[in-house]
Amino acid sequence: MESIVVSNWKMHFSFSEACNYLNLITSLNSNLNLAKMIFAVPNLYLSGLKLKFNDTYHFSAQDVSMITESSGPYTGEISASMLKNLNVNYAIVGHSERRLLFYEDANTIALKVRNCINNAIVPIVCIGEPIEARKNKTYLQYLAQQLSSISFSFTKNVIIAYEPIWSIGSDMIPTIDDIYEVVTMIREIQNRYIPHNIENSVKIVYGGSVSANNIHQILTAGVDGVLIGKASLKLESLTTIIKTVQGLD
């Protein structure tokens, strides 16, 4: 099975810088299969980048509206149907930065996930525990609670991204055993909701300080791929990660 590699650009790059960066990645990695790469770019860039690079890469929105209507009086919102009209096939939902900075709760995230599914967009749903939950050994319960609000999605195409909050943007990373423990727990919870006659299409990726130095170890922890932040903004580290991932597939 090919590993999933999601590059989350967050609020980085001008449009011209984005085009130049993707051109460089393409030219320097012509011998690799880049079609499995998913770039989560600023929503403003989706249309232009898809026109230029749609045959080479997949693109993901970094967020989607919780509003169920396809259109209406909702200033600043971008509906799932609008993304689908651009042939965007992925959307990040519930990233810890949005949970923290924009107070997104379980109900909001569930609405966004449902909107994605109803529009044939694969949601990349982020879950993760704060350092307090890790220290007091309640992290599995914390993560299970986050998963419970989106259990309806487990029979659909969905990507679960485990990103421990305390690891994002830091030099700290869980051990391989820690990641494997969470992956196992996620699989166990999924299996409670998936009938035996339905194939499990849920994928699990790890995010949180993924780098060229630890990518090999992370991919041995039972994950289906990685969600990369700052390491994917640098050509050298992203190229190393791509080569490592494809060397293991």
UniProtKB/Swiss-Prot annotation:
One of its GO terms (biological process) is glycerol catabolic process. The active site is at H95 (electrophile), E163 (proton acceptor). The keyword Glycoprotein does not apply. Substrate binds at N8, W9, K10, G169, S209. Its main location: cytoplasm. It comes from the Bacteria. Pathway: Carbohydrate biosynthesis; gluconeogenesis; Carbohydrate degradation; glycolysis; D-glyceraldehyde 3-phosphate from glycerone phosphate: step 1/1. It is an enzyme of class 5 (isomerase). GO terms for molecular function: triose-phosphate isomerase activity. Keywords: Cytoplasm, Gluconeogenesis, Glycolysis, Isomerase. It is found in: Cytoplasm. GO terms for cellular component: cytosol. Its EC number is 5.3.1.1. It catalyses: D-glyceraldehyde 3-phosphate = dihydroxyacetone phosphate. Coiled coil: none annotated. Belongs to the triosephosphate isomerase family. NCBIfam families: tim. Involved in the gluconeogenesis. Catalyzes stereospecifically the conversion of dihydroxyacetone phosphate (DHAP) to D-glyceraldehyde-3-phosphate (G3P). Homodimer. PANTHER family: TRIOSEPHOSPHATE ISOMERASE. This is Triosephosphate isomerase. It comes from Orientia tsutsugamushi (strain Ikeda). The gene is tpiA.
